[in-house]
Regions:
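Extracellular attachment/recognition segments
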Residues: 1-100
Length: 100
């Protein structure tokens, strides 16, 4: 079993959501199975703006790309009760990949 951890950063943005970002993780040995697990998150409205929390979406998934590489996709969205993605939000999503 091989384990590695990572962090995906989402810079401030408004106008759409949830959004996705990827990070490729390379293991020193060949793998045949892998799973990405969410280990933490830091989410906020940018610039210290004070809003109600209407909807928060955070998740991770993994896909094997080659003999020793996994692409981790993080999904993140934060909005208030307006139903629109009109407020700047940013954050980080922490993950671990377990592979064998």
């Amino acid at each position: 079993m091989q384990i590695t951890q990572g962090l995906i950063t989402f810079s401030p943005m408004s106008g759409s959501g949830p959004r996705t970002a990827t990070e490729d993780v390379t293991f020193p040995n060949a793998i045949t199975t892998a799973v990405a697990l969410l280990t933490g998150m830091n989410v906020e409205y940018s610039n210290g703006d004070d809003h109600h929390l209407g909807n928060l979406q955070v998740g991770v998934s993994g896909a094997i790309l080659g003999s020793n590489t996994v692409r981790v996709t993080a999904t993140y969205g934060l909005r208030d009760w307006s139903g629109n993605w009109d407020d700047d939000y940013d954050g980080t999503v922490s993950f671990v990949v377990v592979a064998s």
